[in-house]
């Protein structure tokens, strides 16, 4: 069984942390992954930096720009991940835009993911129809779970279709804005979470965008299996460096 599916069966609320590969320094990728697992994170999303990250807010955009300046590329990320499965056991997901994957070669990319122990992909600009028609068989051949995003504007019909072609979890975006721009969840967002819950999907949902602390983590996981934090974690690194990523995780999970 894929590590993502195994993790989703665990009887607790899940925390996923996103960070940008090659940030703040080129060599930080492996250290951050290892430290996050030690601190009790359930999933890790490794951001593949891209020059035009449309869905990302300013914090993640800046980290992506810096990572590219540091020399991070798709090939170099796979080099860094070569021995990672000797050091960590939790699910690892690469999150990135489709252009670098196309440039690398989609099948070559999937093959490298399998070789390095990547469990899934989140590709915000890969439409579900295109995935279903052209890439689903290929991704599944290499054991990869492709995670799709839904927003408050996604219709019930579309959500059901996404659910039908998914075999991991559904990324439930808390708003239609960019990452890192929300503070707490209003009535409209809660109504959207409830609407998705009422659809009784086969794939669990994990909430992303606007999760930054224990309060927002708890709010999100009232309606979902887990929550994803990106911008707030990168801000923590900006302010505190990479020497104590565990302190951030402990605050979110309210561990003492």
Curated annotation (Swiss-Prot):
UniProt KW Metal-binding keyword: no
Pathway(s) per entry: Amino-acid biosynthesis; L-tryptophan biosynthesis; L-tryptophan from chorismate: step 5/5
The enzyme's E.C. designation: 4.2.1.20
Keyword Manganese: no
Subunit structure: Tetramer of two alpha and two beta chains.
Assigned protein family: Belongs to the TrpA family.
An example Gene Ontology CC term for this record: cytosol
Organism: Christiangramia forsetii (strain DSM 17595 / CGMCC 1.15422 / KT0803)
TM stretches of this protein: none
Catalytic residues in the record: 45, 56
Keyword annotations from UniProtKB, A to Z: Amino-acid biosynthesis, Aromatic amino acid biosynthesis, Lyase, Tryptophan biosynthesis
Protein name (Swiss-Prot/TrEMBL): Tryptophan synthase alpha chain
Domain of life: Bacteria
CDD domains cross-referenced by the UniProt entry: Tryptophan_synthase_alpha
Protein purpose: The alpha subunit is responsible for the aldol cleavage of indoleglycerol phosphate to indole and glyceraldehyde 3-phosphate.
Reaction catalysis annotation: (1S,2R)-1-C-(indol-3-yl)glycerol 3-phosphate + L-serine = D-glyceraldehyde 3-phosphate + L-tryptophan + H2O
Pfam families: Trp_syntA (PF00290)
Gene name of the encoded protein: trpA
Gene Ontology MF terms in the entry: tryptophan synthase activity
InterPro entries hit by this protein: Aldolase_TIM, RibuloseP-bd_barrel, Trp_synthase_alpha_AS, Trp_synthase_suA
